[in-house]
Amino acid sequence: MIEQDRIISAELKGNDRQVDRAIRPQALAEYIGQPVVREQMEIFIQAARQRGEPLDHTLIFGPPGLGKTTLANIIGNEMGAEVRTTSGPVLERAGDLAALLTNLNEGDILFIDEIHRLSPAIEEVLYPAMEDYQLDIMIGEGPAARSIKIELPPFTLVGATTRAGLLTSPLRDRFGIVQRLEFYDVESLTTIVARSAGKMGVELDQSGCFEVARRSRGTPRIANRLLRRVRDVAQVSGEVLVGQKVAQRALDMLSVDSQGFDHLDRRMLLTMIEKFDGRPVGLDSVSAALGEDKDTIEDVIEPFLIQQGFIIRTPRGRQVTKRAYEHFNYQLPSDFK
C-alpha cells in the first residue's frame, strides 16, 4: 500500500505500536490537547467512580494517529480497570466475542478497535451485552436448538473507529458517551514532541520541537515518527542539543516540507499548476499526468491537500488554490479565478 510507505502516513507502520506504547500518557493529567474531550472525560469518569459504577459505553472516533487507543487505556487507568483489547476484524464468530465477554470481571473495559468492521452477527451478540449485561447464545441445532441467557458482570465497552459513518444506528445509539478527536494545533503538538523527546532521551530545544510539530500534519503519531528520524540525524551528526537547524536538515532529507507535504503532495500540486495552468481538471487527467491510480489520489494524496485549502473540488474538476501558488512562490496567472 502506498500510504504505508509514506513517512507522513498516519497509519501504524513499522515499530510505531511499540514506540507509541512506551511514550503514551497514562493519565488524563498527562493527556495533551483535545481540551473539550479531556474536560468531559474527567467529569464522566469522576462521576462514575463516585457512584461506584462502570463508565458508560464510550465511542471514540476521528482520523488515524490522534490517540484513540491512548485515550481508551487512559480511561482504564483512571477507572482502575483492566483493559481487554481486540479489534473488529479479529472477531469473526459470535463465539469469539462470547469468550471475551464471559471472561470479563466487574468494571473491566473491553476495547474494540476498528469497531466499524464488526460483522452483523457479532453486533447482534453485542446489543444485549451492552444494554442488559446479558449474553444470548444458541445451544444445539435445528428443532432442538434453544437460547440461554448468561448474566455478565457490569463492564464498559470502548469502541474506536476512523469511520464513524459506517457504524450501524443500533450500535451507535448504544454508546452513552461519544467523543470526536480533532487534529492537533501546532502548540499542542510542540508540547507532545517535547514530552516524547524527554521519554526518548533526546535533548530537543523549543525551536526543534516546533519544527517537528509544524510538519506533522496535526497528528501525534506522525510527530513521534518524525522525531525518531530527527534523533537519528542528530546522533550521527554528533549533535547533543537538537535545535531548529538540525530538525530542518533531517526533515528536509525526508522530503517533508514546512506544510507537512511529502514528494507525492508536492508533485500533485505542481502537476496541476504547471501542466494544467491551475485550471479545473478531471480526476482521470490528474491520474494520467501523475502516473498514479485514481484511488490513490482520492484516498491517499488528495484529502490532506483539500483539508489544508490547497485544492478545491469544483463542478468542473479539481483546482489548486492561491495558497498552492504561494507555497511554491509561483506567480498567479492573470486569468486565475
From Swiss-Prot:
Subcellular location(s) per record: Cytoplasm
Pfam families: AAA_lid_4, RuvB_C, RuvB_N
Keywords: ATP-binding, Cytoplasm, DNA damage, DNA recombination, DNA repair, DNA-binding, Hydrolase, Nucleotide-binding
Binding residues annotated for ATP, in chain numbering: 23-24, 65, 68-70, 131-133, 174, 184, 221
Alphabetized InterPro entries for the sequence: AAA+_ATPase (IPR003593), AAA_lid_4 (IPR041445), DNA_helicase_Holl-junc_RuvB (IPR004605), P-loop_NTPase (IPR027417), RuvB-like_N (IPR008824), RuvB_C (IPR008823), WH-like_DNA-bd_sf (IPR036388), WH_DNA-bd_sf (IPR036390)
Stretches for region Large ATPase domain (RuvB-L): 4-184
Region (Head domain (RuvB-H)): 258-337
Location of the region described as Small ATPAse domain (RuvB-S) in the Swiss-Prot/TrEMBL record: 185-255
Predominant cellular place of this UniProt entry's protein: cytoplasm
Annotated binding of Mg(2+), by residue: 69
Residues that coordinate or bind DNA: 313, 318
A GO molecular function held by the record: ATP binding
SMART domains listed in its UniProt record: AAA
Superkingdom classification of source: Bacteria
Reaction equations catalysed: ATP + H2O = ADP + phosphate + H(+)
GO biological process: DNA recombination; DNA repair
GO cellular component, one term: cytoplasm
CDD domains with a match to the protein in the record: AAA (cd00009)
Keyword Disulfide bond attributed: no
EC id: 3.6.4.-
Subunit structure: Homohexamer. Forms an RuvA(8)-RuvB(12)-Holliday junction (HJ) complex. HJ DNA is sandwiched between 2 RuvA tetramers; dsDNA enters through RuvA and exits via RuvB. An RuvB hexamer assembles on each DNA strand where it exits the tetramer. Each RuvB hexamer is contacted by two RuvA subunits (via domain III) on 2 adjacent RuvB subunits; this complex drives branch migration. In the full resolvosome a probable DNA-RuvA(4)-RuvB(12)-RuvC(2) complex forms which resolves the HJ.
PANTHER family reported for this sequence: HOLLIDAY JUNCTION BRANCH MIGRATION COMPLEX SUBUNIT RUVB, PTHR42848
Function summary: The RuvA-RuvB-RuvC complex processes Holliday junction (HJ) DNA during genetic recombination and DNA repair, while the RuvA-RuvB complex plays an important role in the rescue of blocked DNA replication forks via replication fork reversal (RFR). RuvA specifically binds to HJ cruciform DNA, conferring on it an open structure. The RuvB hexamer acts as an ATP-dependent pump, pulling dsDNA into and through the RuvAB complex. RuvB forms 2 homohexamers on either side of HJ DNA bound by 1 or 2 RuvA tetramers; 4 subunits per hexamer contact DNA at a time.
Entry's family note: Belongs to the RuvB family.
Entry comment, domain topic: Has 3 domains, the large (RuvB-L) and small ATPase (RuvB-S) domains and the C-terminal head (RuvB-H) domain. The head domain binds DNA, while the ATPase domains jointly bind ATP, ADP or are empty depending on the state of the subunit in the translocation cycle. During a single DNA translocation step the structure of each domain remains the same, but their relative positions change.
The protein's name in its UniProt record: Holliday junction branch migration complex subunit RuvB
Naturally occurring in which organism (per UniProt): Marinomonas sp. (strain MWYL1)
Organism phylogeny: Bacteria, Pseudomonadati, Pseudomonadota, Gammaproteobacteria, Oceanospirillales
Gene giving rise to this polypeptide: ruvB
